[in-house]
Structure formats: structure tokens, C-alpha cells
Amino acid sequence: MDTELLKTFLEVSRTRHFGRAAESLYLTQSAVSFRIRQLENQLGANLFTRHRNNIRLTPAGERLVPYAEMLLNTWRLAKKEVIHSLQHTELSIGATASLWEAYLTPWLQQLYEQQEELRLEARIALRNSLVKQLHERQLDLLITTEPPKMDELACLLLGHFSLRLYSSFSLDLPKEDDTPNEHKNASEVPYIKLEWGADFHQQENRLLDSEQAPILTTTSAHLTRQLLETTGGCAFLPEHWQKEYPQLVIHPDIPPIVRPLYAVWLQNSDQQALIRQLLKTPMNNATQSVTRE
């Protein structure tokens, strides 16, 4: 069966409109209608009821939807595996947005400076999603602060990095000659919650000792940094950013939070040799706040 027929069927079922489906697929409306007729002929069943502009799935069409989605996903994975086998240097690396923005992008720059022929895929997602992809062999290498506890996974501690509480203004305790509101305590300013892992949140809550709800929860370190001045808030960001962004002010009364950084991959991965080779390039060359063990 032609996968393009299934793709067209799913788009029509989503839009409930042949014209809009044609626009999404960069086809003519007649081409979309022809593909649907082809699929209906192959299956021997009508997939849509058509009453003027009212297009609905028939019971047969409803039953086909999950199978069409599954077949297309399987086909995409099959193509990826075939391409993967032909390009031995291709490697997919996954991490959360905050880790990519703060630590991993400079590391990638180093890798490409050393090996121009590298073929990498940098994947950004939540940790739980990346762990699932790793387990299902859809991801080769996971960089995380919390390694999953699975027997089939290999784990390497890359080092540690420090996070500090920043704001765009001084959060020192007030002095006698200070004007009112010139300084604020960390618990008195809006807080932006940046996702650095479940263990981090326990340390975060203990240090801040504040019951106020965050004004924003995000996975992006750069978004957090850009909003500090706008919101007058504070957030935990990489310690080495003090040099890169001198407008950021560290809260001196809040100690740094030190987090581990791990590399995780499948023990029987066919990419083990390449993974170990890449991990020989230390991340502390790119960000001094990461130290090798």
C-alpha cells in the first residue's frame, strides 16, 4: 500500500476538508480526491461521507485511523533505520532545552571543529520522553542530570555544574543608608521556575523557603534569562553565565546548587564506539562550570 495514500487520508480526516488537506499536502484538490478514491478501492470500503461541505469519517474510516497512524510511524522508523545503517557516523543526542542552551551547544561546536564529517541529530524534549525514546532505540545518547535506573543502560558521569540564583538587580539584605525598596529579599520577588530535574526542585524549595507560586515555569534557560529584567524576578541559572551576561546579579546569600551531568546509552547499542569517542571531548572546554571526574 502506498504510504502517501494513508498520509492523505489522515490529513483529510484531520481537516474534514479536501481543499484544506490539499493545501497542507501541497497538492491539488483533485489529486487529494483521486488518492482517497484509490485507497477506498484498495480497501473495498467508503472512508468518508460527503454531503456538500460536510465531510465525515464512515465507521470504516474511523477504524482505519489508528492503523494508518501506526503504519506511517512504522514506515518512518524503518526509513530511519535504513538511513542509519548507511550513515555510520549519524548519532542522535537528546537533552532538555536548558541543558542544550547552557552546556551542550558549545560542546557540539567543539565536536564539529574536530570532526567535520560528523552527522548528528540534536533532539530537545522532556526527560521522560527522551528516556522512552532511548529505551525504544529511537535515541542513541541521552545527556541528563538524573540517569534512569534500567539494567540495559550504560551510564557515565561527565562531571558537575553549578547553578546560582540570579536577578537583574541586587537582592542583598537592606542596609541603614539604603533607600526603601532598593534591595529585596529573594522570597519577596517573583520567581521563575526553570526545569533542572526532580532532585533540583527539592534543593530549590529548601533554599528559597518560599511558598509563593512561580510566575513562570519553563524548560528554556535563555527564555528565563531574558524575562528576569522584564518581570523583576529571580531564577536559578548556570554560574558561568555571570561572565557571559554581566547584567545578571547573583544573590550572595543563596549558595550554589551543584548538579551532576550524565551520559546514558544502551549497553548493546551499535553506536557505542562513536559515543565513547565523542565523550572523550570534555564539556569543561566549552563551559568551565562542568568538571570531569
Swiss-Prot record:
InterPro entries: LTTR, LysR_subst-bd, Tscrpt_reg_HTH_HdfR, Tscrpt_reg_HTH_LysR, WH-like_DNA-bd_sf, WH_DNA-bd_sf. It holds the Pfam family LysR_substrate. Belongs to the LysR transcriptional regulatory family. Keywords: DNA-binding, Repressor, Transcription, Transcription regulation. One of its GO terms (molecular function) is DNA binding. Residues 1-58 form the HTH lysR-type domain. Negatively regulates the transcription of the flagellar master operon flhDC by binding to the upstream region of the operon. Residues 18-37 bind DNA. The keyword Transcription regulation applies. The gene is hdfR. This is HTH-type transcriptional regulator HdfR. It comes from the Bacteria. PANTHER family: HTH-TYPE TRANSCRIPTIONAL REGULATOR HDFR (PTHR30579:SF8), TRANSCRIPTIONAL REGULATOR (PTHR30579). It comes from Yersinia pestis. Gene3D superfamilies: Periplasmic binding protein-like II (3.40.190.10), Winged helix-like DNA-binding domain superfamily/Winged helix DNA-binding domain (1.10.10.10). One of its GO terms (biological process) is negative regulation of DNA-templated transcription.
